[in-house]
Amino acid sequence: LWSNSQAVYVHRGAVTDVSIAQEFAAQPLFFLRFLLKSVASSVIGVAQIQELEAGSPWFVRLHLVYLLGLAVFVSYLLALYLNVRFQLYKKTIFPLLLVLSGGCNHLLVLAARWIFLKDEYGMSSRYEIQYQMGIVGILLTFALVWSRCREKAQETEADKAKTRVPEKRAARTLLKVCMLAFTVLTVFGNAWTTRAEIRTAPYRKAYLQVS
């Protein structure tokens, strides 16, 4: 830590030398855009997002990446809530640690790369492995909660409890829809991105060999 504190860092391409607090006070929306874009890139690659934007109406084109980022951000919050609500950490703390690790990685990338003042910097593919820990944690949380909901539904059927069953059933259905939607988005987005990367890999290898 002492050695690191004595180091002199040279950020090539940095466009500001003010502190992060000063920059946040000057343009707070930049940090929000940075986070939303980096969070969105954890389920769908940058090239795929750009492809979706290119074929969308102007309103969707302007806001698609932010809507995706917001959806993933809400899923992070939902996973944290479900870990506490169902006390999943008593059975296994692993999903919660993954969720926290993924979220902290987004904040670390922001803290390290805001100085370039490019809100798409956090979408770089080199950060994807760091982000995927959070996505895996969310999916594991959803899987555990889905299993817990099935167990409770079976208990309700067995006991034939009538009190507040419709409300609980509606809440469980809504929760399942949200979890299923995020799972489909994640699987589809990662499959699409991986397929494109596999197709691009030979050309990237040839380019690196020449250069």
Predicted regions and their residues:
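Membrane-interface helix-boundary motifs at transmembrane edges
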Residues: 82-92, 165-170
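Transmembrane alpha-helices and membrane-interface helical segments
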Residues: 76-79, 132-152
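Membrane-embedded, lumen/periplasm-facing catalytic core of multi-pass transferases
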Residues: 116-129, 171-211
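Transmembrane alpha-helix segments characteristic
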Residues: 1, 86-115
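Membrane-lumen/periplasm interface segments of multi-pass, membrane-embedded glycan/lipid transferases
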Residues: 2-82, 117, 125, 132
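Signature aromatic-anchored transmembrane alpha helix within multi-pass, membrane-resident enzymes
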Residues: 1, 95, 146-191
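Lipid-exposed faces of alpha-helical membrane segments in multi-pass integral membrane proteins
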Residues: 71, 97-108, 139-142, 181-188
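Flexible internal linker/loop segments at domain or repeat junctions
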Residues: 101-126, 139, 148, 152
